[in-house]
Amino acid sequence: MKIQLDMYQTLAVAVLVLLLGNYLKKKIYFLQKFCIPAPVIGGLIFAIMTCICYVTGIAEFSFDDTLREVCMVFFFTSVGFQANLKVLKSGGKSLIVFLGLVIVLIILQNLTAVGLAKLLNLNPLIGMCTGSIPMVGGHGTAGAFGPVLEDLNIKGATTICTAAATFGLIFGSLIGGPLGKRLIEKHSLLNTTANDDDSLLVEDEKKHERHTNMYADAVFQLILAIGVGTIFTILLTKTGLTFPIYIGAMLAAALMRNICEYTGIATIHMGEINDLGGISLSLFLGMAMITLRLWELASLALPLIILLAAQVLLIIIFTYVIEFNIMGRDYDAAILVSGTCGFGTGATPNAMANMQAVCDQYVPSIKAYLLIPLVGSLFADFLNSLVITFFINLL
């Protein structure tokens, strides 16, 4: 039996799993302690149920992901509005260092994948199916490079890449929060949160306090940025490169924010925009989790499971040992670790959800909230594509 849910029903189910996740997180200390995002909790439970239904032949669920994309774009537009040039200037050095770390991570993921594939007597290109293509790249890059590998006689490359991206999505969501929390508590990092970035955030919040009657204006500003962003997206695609669909909206939002800040022509309602962005993120992640096809992981052979386990181990060691120390061993660095686990093995929205889960328990990190989406959405995909292309041609 095939059960087809339209976009309204899909959204309703996402809300139900989100509410379930919030309820379980409040009731189960373990989930709260390790900062597991609520959409991941409820979404995984639902995904396991649909997997059981599929395997036993009871039912196969099909979802309409139209609103998932809308929520994702709304969220990243809200992130774009956070791009205050004063904050970005103060974090210039951190941006360059973090970008360098991401490049190193991409290279290490592919070296690990290719090296292990050779040890397991697999075609190195099969190893690439578990490297940075699905890890840093996520489902989008997996869908783009899977057919390329199939053209190189790697049978089922798209399925392997997609399944690996699903694997990374799950584990990236599960390990990010606990790692960030452990670093914060182990090194008593809450006393390192007072810095220039945070003072700018406090100043910004004072200028943009929340008012109920301003939420409509905030929605209008988000929609306007998304509309203008489509023009930017069209221009970017003419370069021949592949960009996430939300990058144009992010750029438009950042432009609107700084023009308004500089000229005073209008007030950007940041408090309300941040609230709406948080809601959009929860809804997006809820819909992303309920549409996971867990049975695709069961079809992976043991060597591929080993390859994927190695990627999880790599991201843990890299973020916990290398990234945390290089990024300053402070609270911001711990939140960056949590976020990197999200987009380093899954997707930028998972990174944001990881950081939100940790920050909800402690305090916000404006540096992490700017660096992760900026690098994860704008630079990482571009650099990843270059590195992947280099490795494929080398092999």
Model-derived regions: residue spans:
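Juxtamembrane and boundary regions of transmembrane helices in multi-pass small-molecule transporters
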Residues: 115-122, 165-202, 318-331, 376-395
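Membrane-embedded hairpin module used as a gating/binding unit in multi-pass transport
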Residues: 17-18, 169-262
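Flexible hinge motifs at transmembrane-helix junctions and intramembrane kinks/re-entrant loops
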Residues: 24-40, 57, 61, 230-251, ...
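Hydrophobic transmembrane alpha-helices of secondary-active transporters
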Residues: 17, 44-51, 64-92, 251-260, ...
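C-terminal ends of transmembrane helices
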Residues: 20-32, 78-90, 179-181, 255-270, ...
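Entry/N-cap segments of selected transmembrane alpha helices
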Residues: 84-114, 219-222, 290-320
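Alpha-helical membrane segments and immediately flanking helix-loop junctions
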Residues: 112, 116-156, 160, 167, ...
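Structural signature of hydrophobic alpha-helical transmembrane segments
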Residues: 2-16, 62-75, 125-132, 240-252, ...
